[in-house]
A protein has these predicted regions:
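Short glycine-/aliphatic-rich beta-strand segments at the starts of folded cytosolic domains
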Residues: 5-27, 93-104, 185-196
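Short, conserved charged micro-motifs
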Residues: 19-24, 74-78, 119-124, 199-204, ...
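Short, intrinsically disordered, mixed-charge
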Residues: 25, 29-33, 75, 79-87, ...
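Anionic-ligand-binding alpha/beta catalytic cores of soluble enzymes and soluble regulatory domains
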Residues: 114-194
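Glycine-rich, small/acidic residue-mixed loop/short-helix segments
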Residues: 51, 158-164, 172-174, 178-256
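Acidic, low-complexity central loop/insert segments
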Residues: 3-5, 9-12, 54-143
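Glycine-centered loop/turn motifs
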Residues: 38-39, 87, 141, 146, ...
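Acidic, proline/glycine-enriched N-terminal capping motif
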Residues: 1-53
């Protein structure tokens, strides 16, 4: 399944200056020092307590980096960068124009960069609100800031965990992230739920007792509902049977 998704409304910043690599290395979870020209990496900007302030894609573009973030947090992301850049030789240039992302399947959605330019000839970029985009997004565990992740969450509780480089040097929020990793005691994690019945579940709906968890996103898919939910470690194992809003559900690892 190939989906070409319109990302023209996303915020994109070109980062230049002599301190660009050191600055981003010390502020984001992305190991920018490892990015070769043309490569990209997903990650986050954290607060000092290790909570997620922004989800970003960082792409190496010659002697610069391009940072992309959702439209809803584009201004906040730029403000964060500028706040930390007081004594650094860095400059931020907003980029505009068409952009898109290509998803071939849920397993590779997080590998897809944000690409500047028009859609390939003969293809039409779908809006983010397209039901097919939402179904694949949920199967991939592709986060929406303010919906599936926010200032209450650690990156290791989300699919961003796969991008955390524990061999990287210091960055803002690193200590609590490394501490929990070393102790191995995360309490919650984002998982997929396949729920009986084709009626979406309201965000914030709690799982039925005794399971502990909360739905963040959901979408009807055939005669069932697919959802993302933060589950407590006592019920997050793939294949576990839980219930939400009186409906039976099965836990799935992400992507699925």
């Amino acid at each position: 399944m190939r989906l070409l998704i319109d990302r023209s409304e996303w915020g994109r910043l070109r980062v230049t200056g002599g301190d660009r690599t050191r600055f981003l290395q010390g502020l984001t979870t992305v190991n920018v020092e490892k990015l070769a020209d043309g490569q990209h990496g997903w990650g986050a900007i954290l607060n000092p307590k290790g909570r997620v302030l922004s989800v970003i894609d960082v792409a190496r573009d010659g002697d610069a980096y391009v940072i992309a973030s959702e439209a809803s947090i584009a201004q906040a992301t730029r403000a964060l960068l500028e706040r930390y850049a007081v004594m650094d030789d860095v400059a931020f240039e907003p980029l505009s124009g068409p952009a898109h992302q290509v998803w071939d399947d849920p397993a590779t959605a997080w590998d897809a960069p944000i690409v500047a330019g028009e859609a390939p000839s003969g293809e039409v970029a779908r809006p983010e609100t397209d039901p097919e985009v939402e179904r694949l997004r949920i199967r991939a565990g592709f986060l929406r800031y303010g919906v599936d992740v926010g200032e209450d969450h650690f990156p290791f509780e989300t699919p961003l965990a796969r991008f955390l480089d524990y061999g990287k040097g210091c960055y803002v929020g690193q200590e609590p992230v490394f501490r929990v990793h070393a102790q191995g005691n995360a309490a919650h994690a984002l998982r997929g739920l396949l729920i009986e019945g084709a009626a979406p579940i309201a965000p914030g709906t709690k799982l039925d007792a005794p399971a502990k968890g909360e739905v963040t996103s959901s979408v009807a898919d055939g005669d069932a509902t697919r959802a993302l939910a933060y589950l407590h470690r006592t019920c997050w194992e793939p294949g576990a049977a839980v219930a939400v809003a009186g409906r039976r559900a099965t836990v799935h690892e992400l992507p699925w």
